[in-house]
């Protein structure tokens, strides 16, 4: 319901602003003829050139570009190296084992503390 009313409102607003919702008759001459906008002449210079913002082109340093492209290729090859992938896997595995062991130690300490509290209460 809400979507339908929103769509009707948008369509009505569009037709209202454009003024072309419905033509009066087939022979109506009330329409506007196609032509250039009066402000379109503002964008053309006296020399018939368009007035666009000019940007100075920097001189390209091809040697630096070449070094960058080889650097990217070198990085891509490093990422595809299976030896480094295996090393990374084992390093991450060691970190995971360390975190798991720390969690187990904390759980054991909590269990020990609960037993001590239970013994002291009885």
UniProtKB/Swiss-Prot annotation:
Query: Region Nuclear localization signal (NLS): start and end of each range?
Result: 87-98
Q: Localized where? A: Secreted; Host nucleus
GO cellular component, alphabetical, reads: extracellular region; host cell nucleus
Q: List the disulfide bonds.
A: none
Q: What is the effect of changing residue 91 to A?
A: Impairs host nuclear localization
Q: Which GO terms describe its biological process?
A: symbiont-mediated perturbation of host transcription
- Keywords carried by this UniProt record: Host nucleus, Secreted, Signal, Virulence
According to the UniProt entry, where is the signal peptide?
1-21
Q: Which InterPro entries match?
A: RXLR
Coiled-coil regions in this chain? none
TAP1-binding as annotated region, ranges:
69-86
Q: Where is this motif: RxLR-dEER?
A: 50-68
Pfam families in the record, alphabetically? RXLR (PF16810)
> Which phenotype arises from disrupting this gene?
Leads to smaller lesions on soybean seedlings.
Subunit annotation:
Interacts with host acetyl transferase TAP1.
The record's comment on protein family reads: Belongs to the RxLR effector family.
Can you name this protein?
A: RxLR effector protein Avh52
Provide the species name.
Phytophthora sojae (strain P6497) (Soybean stem and root rot agent)
From the broadest rank down, the organism's phylogenetic lineage runs: Eukaryota, Sar, Stramenopiles, Oomycota, Peronosporales
């Amino acid at each position: 319901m809400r979507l339908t009313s929103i769509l009707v409102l948008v369509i009505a607003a569009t037709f209202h602003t454009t003024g072309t919702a419905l033509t009066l008759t087939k022979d109506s001459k009330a329409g506007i003829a196609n032509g250039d906008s009066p402000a379109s002449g503002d964008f053309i210079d006296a020399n018939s050139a368009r007035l666009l913002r000019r940007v100075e082109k920097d001189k390209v340093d091809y040697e630096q570009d070449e070094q960058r492209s080889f650097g990217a290729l070198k990085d891509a090859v490093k990422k595809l190296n299976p030896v480094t992938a295996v090393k990374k896997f084992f390093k991450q595995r060691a970190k995971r084992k360390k975190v798991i062991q720390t969690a187990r130690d904390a759980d054991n300490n909590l269990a020990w503390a609960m037993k001590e509290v239970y013994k002291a209460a009885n």
